Design a protein with these regions (language model features):
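Charge-rich, low-complexity N-terminal segments
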Residues: 14-20, 27, 64-67
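Secretory pathway targeting signatures of secreted, lumenal, and periplasmic proteins
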Residues: 46-105, 139-141
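Long, compositionally biased interface segments
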Residues: 87-91, 95-112, 173-194
Length: 194
């Protein structure tokens, strides 16, 4: 009985914390509609996030924080991902996107998935769409940078493409729990629009 109540209490605290974070985000939401125009998805995030990179199939927004930054990237892919191969496919996709779009500080460096610590994989439903959630650690190939990431990949049956939205944090020697909570809260607001 105690354990059941602790789980219920813990979930209630998380739900209330998420509601409060959304309330604060909605005080000053962004007017940026690039994600909506490009991919047909709406994402609620604060106006303090600024676009870092915007290409034909990739959007990267960033918020500066003390000693680092919070990042959200979004892109679509046409790939054959199934329950049998999603954990390998997602990591390979992340690494190829990192090499293409997310450079490190040094020449020839770029973001990849850290393989030393096995990421966690989950099946999810978000905005009524089935998909996958991956939580793990990113690092920079050929440099010494790393941090946590959370990656959602959702199937859009209308376009027959996967929508990928990912949050990652770089804040050396800082507790990243609140940063990752903010990124996850923002990402879970994703909605398909016409």
């Amino acid at each position: 009985l105690f354990e059941e109540n602790m789980l219920l209490f813990s979930q209630t605290v998380k739900d209330n914390e998420r509601k409060e974070k959304l309330r604060r985000i909605n005080k000053s939401p962004t007017n940026d509609k690039d994600l909506k125009k490009r991919f047909g998805y709406d994402l609620v995030y604060p106006s303090v996030y600024e676009t870092v990179k915007d290409t034909a199939n990739f959007i990267w927004i960033q918020k500066q924080v003390q000693k680092g930054h919070l990042n959200i990237i979004a892109y679509e892919i046409s790939d054959n991902i199934s329950d049998k191969n999603f954990n390998t496919k997602i990591l390979n996709i992340r690494d190829s996107i990192g090499k293409l779009y997310i450079p490190g500080r040094l020449k020839g460096s770029y973001m990849i998935t850290e393989r030393a610590y096995q990421p966690y994989f989950y099946k999810v439903t978000l905005d009524g769409k089935k998909g996958y959630l991956t939580k793990g650690t990113w690092e920079v190939a050929n440099d010494f940078m790393a941090g946590p990431f959370i990656n959602y990949i959702l199937w859009n049956s209308l376009t027959e493409k996967w929508m990928v939205v990912e949050g990652f944090t770089f804040a050396p020697s800082m507790n990243k729990r609140d940063y990752m909570f903010e990124l996850n809260t923002i990402i879970t607001t994703i909605k398909k629009v016409n």
